[in-house]
Amino acid sequence: MKRNIDSFRKGLIDGIPIALGYFAVSFTLGIRGGDVGLKWYQSALMSATNYTSAGQAAALSILEEGGSYIELVISTLVINLRYLLMSAALTIKLSPKEKTGMRMLMGIGVTDEIFGISIAQKTPISPLYNIGAMSVACPGWVLGTALGGIMGEILPPVVTSSLSIALYAMFLAIIIPPARENKV
């Protein structure tokens, strides 16, 4: 029992930096949702059901261009297929004694970042570690989108358009430091 609590707590702690990063990215997606005509709560609902910036960005582009819901669903499914593979890779590192329900619960919130910290854990990993990380990271994602959507409805367009470049700035902030250290 103590091991389970410790695993969950470690997941919570390891999920905090992920939640902060998610907040920044999803904030811009919330603003972008408003730009294509969604209310803040619609953008937040999209984030609550789709924990991927690529999937949401594609969905927003399809909505903006007047695409059909079939196109939106197919695009999102194709973009998110990688999570099926990530979930399968994580189950290999689980104890064979883990119940199917825990395995499925663990797979619901797999994202690139949560997969990364989970797969780095020693074998066998605990589903509670993954669930702990999801418990803080996923609400950070949804909250960021909701607040971005609210701010997008309040702030003037000139401000929101400048905030929408934050997503690109974050990618540069992630890429540039390692690129400086690992010159090829």
Where are these regions (language model features)?
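Helix-loop-helix hairpins and the membrane-proximal interhelical loops
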Residues: 1-50, 61-76
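Loop-to-transmembrane-helix entry motif
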Residues: 11, 15-19, 158, 162, ...
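Small-residue-rich segments of transmembrane alpha-helices in multi-pass membrane proteins
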Residues: 22, 49-55, 107-111, 140-142, ...
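Alpha-helical transmembrane segments of multipass membrane proteins
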Residues: 27-31, 48, 58-59, 117, ...
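Helix-loop-helix junctions within the multi-pass membrane cores of secondary transporters/permeases
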Residues: 73-164
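Membrane-helix interface "capping/anchor" motifs
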Residues: 176-184
